[in-house]
Amino acid sequence: MALTKADMTETLYQELGLNKREAKEIVEMFFEDIRCALEQGEAVKLSGFGNFELRDKGERPGRNPKTGEEIPITARRVVTFRPGQKLKARVEAYAGGKQ
């Protein structure tokens, strides 16, 4: 199961007493702010959660799996996420209890 924006909206609706339209707008604005910051080349740092950063990947050789032909994979910019220590600790504690 995955957490969705609809789930987040529902949680804001139930826990904070916002109406569904307001809750949906807050969730959408949150993600739009993250998108805008990343589009402008800024890192996004969410204390206690983690960091979203941009990383430039250089061109590298690739291979067509069907033909075996070498094909260059073009340079590109990707978004990476690095979890913070608090998030890591909570995930590890939860995962440790499930084993």
From Swiss-Prot:
Keywords: DNA recombination, DNA-binding, Transcription, Transcription regulation, Translation regulation. It holds the Pfam family Bac_DNA_binding. GO terms for biological process: DNA recombination; positive regulation of metabolic process; regulation of DNA-templated transcription; regulation of translation. GO terms for cellular component: cytosol. GO terms for molecular function: DNA binding; structural constituent of chromatin. Gene3D superfamilies: IHF-like DNA-binding proteins. The keyword DNA-binding applies. The keyword DNA-binding applies. It comes from the Bacteria. Belongs to the bacterial histone-like protein family. Heterodimer of an alpha and a beta chain. This protein is one of the two subunits of integration host factor, a specific DNA-binding protein that functions in genetic recombination as well as in transcriptional and translational control. This is Integration host factor subunit alpha. It comes from Nitrosococcus oceani (strain ATCC 19707 / BCRC 17464 / JCM 30415 / NCIMB 11848 / C-107).
